[in-house]
A protein has these predicted regions:
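Hinge/capping helix and adjacent helix->loop/strand transition within the periplasmic-binding protein
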Residues: 3, 25-34, 47-136, 173
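Beta->alpha turn/N-cap motifs
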Residues: 38-43, 133-134, 150-156, 171-173
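Short, Asp-centered acidic motifs that coordinate Mg2+ and/or phosphate
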Residues: 33-37, 72, 147-148, 167
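Early extracytoplasmic/lumenal segment of secretory-pathway proteins
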Residues: 6-24
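Sec/Tat-exported extracytoplasmic proteins
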Residues: 1-5, 13, 30, 38, ...
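C-terminal lobe and pocket-closing loops
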Residues: 68, 83-84, 155-177
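Short helices/loops that flank or line small-molecule/ion binding pockets
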Residues: 20-32, 116-117, 121, 135-149, ...
Length: 177
C-alpha cells in the first residue's frame, strides 16, 4: 500500500484470537485518522456471538473490500461412501454422530458458525474437528482421518487443480461461475 499511496504505513500485526486481539488494540487506538484496521469476517462472527464486541456495521467504516469469497464442503475426489451432498447427508445421518469434518479451530469463527447452521438445517450430527493451521486440516482430509473438509476454494486451490478434492456444497448467495 505504501508504494501505491506514497505514504509510509507501519504494520502492527497482532496475532491471536482470530483477529480479536487486533480488534481490541485497534478499538483502543486514537480515532485520529492515522489508524487503519485490516480484518476478516471473524469481526462479524465475534459480534454475533458477543454483542459487547465491536459491531462492524456501526463501529467500522470500510475503506476497501479486498475479497469476497464463499465457503464449500469438500470430499476426497476418490471417496466412495458418498459422492455428492444428498448422499453425504444420508451417510452422516447413518453414522449416529461419529462422522467428522475438518474445520478451523476458533470457536465462534464464521466457518464454525456456518457449519452449525448447516448441520441443524440438514438434521445431521457431525463432529467438527479443529485444526489451527491449513496444512494439517488438508492432510487429515486427504489421508481419510476426517470425512469432509469445510474451507474456501482459494485456500485449497492446488488440491482442486490436482483433482484431490471436490466440492459437494457451496455456501454463497449465487452459484459460482
Amino acid at each position: 500500500v505504501t508504494g501505491l499511496t506514497g505514504v509510509s504505513i507501519n504494520r502492527d500485526h497482532k496475532p491471536g484470537g482470530s483477529g480479536t486481539v487486533g480488534m481490541t488494540a485497534y478499538m483502543a487506538a486514537p480515532a485520529d485518522g492515522y489508524n487503519v484496521l485490516e480484518h476478516i469476517d471473524d469481526a462479524s462472527s465475534a459480534h454475533a456471538l458477543d454483542s459487547s464486541r465491536p459491531n462492524p456495521a456501526e463501529d467500522l467504516i470500510p475503506l476497501v473490500v479486498s475479497q469476497v469469497t464463499f465457503s464449500q464442503i469438500y470430499i476426497r475426489s476418490n471417496e466412495t461412501r458418498y459422492t455428492d451432498w444428498p448422499s453425504f447427508v444420508k451417510w452422516v445421518q447413518a453414522q449416529n454422530g461419529k462422522a467428522t469434518i475438518a474445520n478451523v479451530s476458533k470457536e465462534g469463527s464464521m466457518e464454525r458458525v456456518i457449519m452449525k447452521f448447516i448441520t441443524e438445517a440438514s438434521d445431521m450430527q457431525i463432529q467438527q474437528i479443529s485444526f489451527d493451521k491449513g496444512a494439517p486440516r488438508y492432510g487429515a482430509s486427504l489421508g481419510g482421518q476426517v470425512d469432509a473438509l469445510f474451507e474456501q476454494p482459494g485456500d485449497v486451490r492446488k488440491f482442486l487443480d490436482a483433482g484431490n478434492f471436490k466440492p459437494i456444497l457451496t455456501v454463497f448467495n449465487e452459484r459460482p461461475g
